[in-house]
Swiss-Prot record:
Pathway: Carbohydrate biosynthesis; gluconeogenesis; Carbohydrate degradation; glycolysis; D-glyceraldehyde 3-phosphate and glycerone phosphate from D-glucose: step 2/4. GO terms for molecular function: carbohydrate derivative binding; glucose-6-phosphate isomerase activity; monosaccharide binding. This is Glucose-6-phosphate isomerase. One of its GO terms (cellular component) is cytosol. Belongs to the GPI family. Keywords: Cytoplasm, Gluconeogenesis, Glycolysis, Isomerase. It comes from Shewanella loihica (strain ATCC BAA-1088 / PV-4).
């Protein structure tokens, strides 16, 4: 296969990037631009008209996708082929959203029945806890869930429960612990009562350093505050593949939920890793979350590339990284409940596409994954939006807004929407020198002063953005939104021909961290590592500067 950067479409896109008119001109030339460059699917509307693209750009982007075999790669993932080539694994988080009558094979076995059995087990457990049938060791009902995990087993459930706050069971609270920093755990334990607290420990191996350390400390706290070893089973459950270690810990085998190798951590919220979500919002709403993601799966598989929402978003991100040297991408959520999504999408994209070799091990000769960052509108407008408007770096943006608020109050939501739409317009349109100068008419300043100030008020514009709308934030629309970004991430990795489903950089950090831990716990002065690491270890062991 011809290298990506040697494809004709690549050369065409390079040429077009240098000569494409300003977006102001593109909108002036085509009053129907929004109608032509917007798309509705799965309860979401994507407005991609404020991107640096004309019909030729789109044509070449789709040509590039086709030359990379994108459609075949999409089907390969959904069919359970081994697309994670370094770990020899299928990638089937989509199977967690499958219908009961679907057949999805892994090693010749249909995995859908096992998925459905696990969901049924989750439903039974959720009902027991939320109904009050499940009691703590003193006979009291559960009031607090403490979810202990790290990475995908922490961030996904945390962000989803945060986003779906209006759907919470009022009788339950959920607290999330990930960092091995003791402060994280201790602050949560101060909020809960051992008699009414349920700990959900999520670790595939039951040996992840941070998760195991936090779980052992939680167990010690529980035993210190009235619980006994026999009571552990009433207050600790696990999501793990290592049943033996979980039962040795004191958990009942009936309350251990499975994990599978064909689900990566950052794609795992749809599995039993989502147990804290289900406990808080109820199993019916959890099923709606899955249904929303399933609808996006269906759209991704069936829609032509030219009308495919994840494909379009992935291609535009690729366009800016590879042809405009954009090194970051900002996600701006105009809904307080969605304030955590940028961090979730950050992990999803950067852990997936932060790669520098192709599937065959060749060094890539182009940029891959950008830095993903962002925050909550309108807060960001009074902070980092300044850089978006007048900084020297091109930073594409995604704006996300529900049309209806869960908390309608006066003019709040219409003001929120006006800021969202106004920002996308300002980024696209900018302000010319003449426009800035005209705004100063009537002031008492000299012409020289006006000219100087006008130069500082100029904004180039032509800054690209997508706008994503939904009627209202619900479990179903949230599921579709998260699946959209999952598939958008896949599209980029598939075209770049990289493995979006391993994370060897993360693994190296774990290995070296364990090595350093052994040296920190040793009585001997650190000498074997580099001079900097040795000095830092010795300073830490001394306990002061």
């Amino acid at each position: 296969m011809t290298k990506l950067t040697q494809q004709d479409a690549w050369a065409q896109l390079e040429a077009q990037a240098a000569k494409l008119p300003h977006m102001r001109e593109l909108f002036e030339a085509d009053p129907q631009r929004f109608d032509k460059m917007s798309l509705s699917a799965c309860g979401l509307l994507l407005d991609y008209s404020k991107n640096r693209a004309d019909e030729q750009t789109l044509e070449q982007l789709f040509k590039l996708a086709k030359s990379a075999g994108l459609s075949d790669k999409i089907h390969a993932m959904f069919d359970g082929e081994i697309i994670n080539n370094t770990e020899k694994r299928a990638v089937l988080h989509t199977a967690l959203r499958a219908e009961a009558d679907e057949v999805i094979l892994v090693d010749g076995q249909n995995i859908v029945p096992e998925v459905k059995q696990t969901q049924a087990k989750m439903a039974k457990f959720v009902e027991a806890v939320t109904s009050g049938e499940w009691k703590g060791y003193t006979g009291k009902a559960i009031t607090d869930i403490v979810s202990i995990g790290i990475g995908g087993s922490f961030l996904g459930p945390k962000i989803v429960t945060q986003a779906l706050r209006p759907y919470w069971n009022p009788a339950l609270k959920c607290h999330f612990v990930a960092n091995v920093d003791a402060t994280s755990l201790c602050e949560k334990l101060r909020l809960v009562d051992p008699e009414t607290t349920l700990f959900v420990m999520s670790s595939k191996s039951f040996g992840t350093q941070e998760t195991l350390t936090n779980t052992l400390s939680a167990k010690a706290w529980f035993l210190k505050n009235g619980g006994t070893q026999v009571d552990i089973a009433k207050h600790f459950v696990a999501v793990t593949s290592n049943v033996a270690k979980a039962t040795e810990f004191g958990m009942d085998a009936d309350n251990i939920f499975p994990m599978w190798d064909w689900v990566g951590g950052r794609y795992s919220l749809w599995s039993a890793i989502g147990l804290p979500i289900a406990l808080l919002i109820g199993m019916d709403n959890f099923y709606q979350l899955l249904a929303g993601a399933k609808s996006m799966d269906k759209h991704f598989v069936e829609a032509p590339l030219e009308q495919n929402m994840p494909v379009i978003m992935g291609l535009f991100s690729l366009l800016y990284g590879n042809f405009y040297q954009a090194q970051s991408h900002v996600v701006l959520t105009y809904d307080h409940y969605l304030r955590g999504l940028p961090a979730y999408f950050q992990q999803l994209d950067m852990e997936s596409n932060g790669k520098s070799v192709t599937l065959n091990g060749d060094n890539v000769d182009h940029a891959t994954g950008p830095v993903i960052w962002g925050g909550e509108g309108t807060n960001g407008q009074h902070a980092y939006h300044q850089l978006l408007h007048q900084g020297t770096a091109l930073i594409p943006a995604d704006f996300i807004l529900p049309l209806q608020s869960h908390n309608p109050l006066g003019e709040h939501h219409v003001q929120l929407a006006s800021n969202c739409f106004g920002q996308t317009q300002a980024l696209m349109q900018g302000r010319t020198f003449d426009e800035a100068l005209a705004e100063l008419d009537g002031s008492s300043q000299s012409q020289e002063e006006k000219a100087l100030i006008a130069k500082h008020k100029v904004m180039e514009g032509n800054k690209p953005s997508n706008t994503l709308l939904m009627d209202k934030l619900t479990p179903e629309t949230l599921g579709a939104l998260i699946a959209l970004y999952e598939h958008r991430t896949f599209v980029q990795g598939a075209i770049w021909d990289i493995n979006s489903f391993d994370q060897w950089g993360v693994e190296l950090g774990k290995t070296l961290g364990n090595d350093v831990l052994a040296r920190l716990q040793s009585d001997e002065e650190a000498k074997a590592l580099d001079a900097s690491s040795n000095a830092l270890i010795n300073l830490f062991r001394r306990g002061h500067l």
